[in-house]
Amino acid sequence: MKSVLRIAAAIFWLWLFIVLGVIGSGNVRDTDDEISLLESQLVVTSPSQLLMVPLTLIQAAASKGAVCLDGTLPGYHLHPGSGSGANRWLIQLEGGGWCNTRRSCIFRKTTRRGSSNHMEKVLAFTGILSNKSNENPDFFNWNRVKLRYCDGASFTGDSQDESSQLYYRGQRIWHSAMEELLSKGMQKAEQALLSGCSAGGLASILHCDQFKELFPGTTTVKCLSDAGMFMDAVDVSGGHSLRKMFQGVVTVQNLQKELSTACTKHLDPTSCFFPQNLVSGIKTPMFLLNAAYDAWQVQESLAPPSVDLSGSWKACKSDHSHCNSSQIQFFQDFRTHMVDAVKSFATSTHNGVFINSCFAHCQSERQDTWYAPDSPTLHGKTVAESVGDWYFDRTTVKAIDCPYPCDKTCHNLIFK
């Protein structure tokens, strides 16, 4: 029965991927958005069994200029905690790529990633947001929030383009959302966790220490970045596709003044948007959860269509079983780059690491990769168990997988 469900889920996933398409026309393709959405649907579950949480718009945001790209109000989904979790808060920052040109930001205004007019009115809470103890053993009864992403720069911008009526106000959205949640009871939090997936995982890194400053010293505050370890890596043509993309984001949204000053004193602003140059300087305890062969980075950073003009990587990046030995070695070099980048970070006793050798993305939001009977494991522990062990100081977690293809527990993504 389990295999039937997995096959059915895969068929649904492939169909939805084709239907959604991509943001093309030479701009940043929102593959991150697609993967995040599609992964949440991988487990075939009846809608009646899912916790559906309504959207709340932040009414006070408008007067502060804390608005989405198109000027609409930002929003979040909150499911209140209960029992022992009544004064515990988990904030999940939504992912969804970036816009790196005026044109791509204008397009983004017509989607839920740039306008609350297009956001779903209810969202399913699964994985780390689930309210079931058998699906989310450590955080199921916490106050759980999903903060919607509509600024295109991982909640960091504070400028605008008047001629195009674009509002780059991610930093203001962050502040406005935190003020609202504090007024909703988060100021009484005994424990708090800031998490995020993909572009939201990067945002969790960028805002981690700011999040800590919201609470008194008696509150336990930690951060989780899921699939947020975007690497300044060489692509298959020898160039730096992701650096070019990030440079566009930093320039278009004028992020220079919003980035870590400790970093920008030594490196250029674009380098200070890459987590590898930030994580070791974060003072708040943090957990890095990442697939060593991150599916989004394989698709859009290592072998994007713009540099694979011959299409020689198309089959390989769609399904790693179609890769030749030299292509696999290219991925192994990328894994080594990532592992080396977290070595200093991992030396801190307060930090946690879970890097599995899978072709995956956003493993905390999906139920089948977060906590399920056949979930991916490292050292005999699921992602959920590992994050819980780290957060509650049950044990240290420094789990780095052996290279592909040694891990047989992966839920790898395959594109058609």
Curated annotation (Swiss-Prot):
Transmembrane segments: none annotated. Hydrolyzes acetyl esters in homogalacturonan regions of pectin. In type I primary cell wall, galacturonic acid residues of pectin can be acetylated at the O-2 and O-3 positions. Decreasing the degree of acetylation of pectin gels in vitro alters their physical properties. GO terms for molecular function: pectin acetylesterase activity. InterPro entries: PAE/NOTUM. This is Pectin acetylesterase 3. Residues 1-25 form the signal peptide. Glycans are attached at N131, N324. GO terms for biological process: cell wall organization. Its main location: secreted. It is found in: Secreted, Cell wall. The active site is at S198 (charge relay system), D294 (charge relay system), H361 (charge relay system). Keywords: Cell wall, Cell wall biogenesis/degradation, Glycoprotein, Hydrolase, Secreted, Signal. It comes from Arabidopsis thaliana. GO terms for cellular component: extracellular region. Pfam families: PAE. The gene is PAE3. Its EC number is 3.1.1.-. Belongs to the pectinacetylesterase family. It is an enzyme of class 3 (hydrolase). Disruption phenotype: No visible phenotype under normal growth conditions.
